[in-house]
Amino acid sequence: TLAAAVDHLICIHDFEVPFYEPHGLACTVCGHPALGRYTPGDGAALRARQGFTPTEKIILVLPGSRSAEIRRIGPALWAAAELLDRDRDVRILTVAANSVREQVTAQVPATVRILDESEKEDAFAAATVALAASGTVTTEVALQGTPVVVGYKLGWITWAIARAFL
């Protein structure tokens, strides 16, 4: 069990403590960095700026902020978004960090609108659903009240090591 393997558990969220303590785990909540920098987004304003109606569905694709993430998980997220794009009332957006904007631009389908990082909170709030690489962004999107489908793809060496234990 987890209690046999660790002496003390560092939790990100307060709601984790009541789950772990009854199993004999001492817990300390350290918090999450996204909670300290949360800014409410204005989804209606983003929809107006982009010319979207209130009824159009917005799929927000967030393939990561690091080159390796974008290379590994990006294609799967874009493939899922393209399946959803068959509906005429769907718009696909992405927010690209400045450090990977060129890489994201080269990867996205032509119908995708690429937003500046300064619009991320508004995009998070405007989205009907987000398809996101696992990371801090999933918490940031969830704080805006938007459902998130989280994806992750291991590198082949990590996968091979993990597979040996499963």
Task: Describe every region a protein language model picked out.
Residues 1-166:
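Nucleotide-activated sugar donor-binding and catalytic core shared by glycosyltransferases
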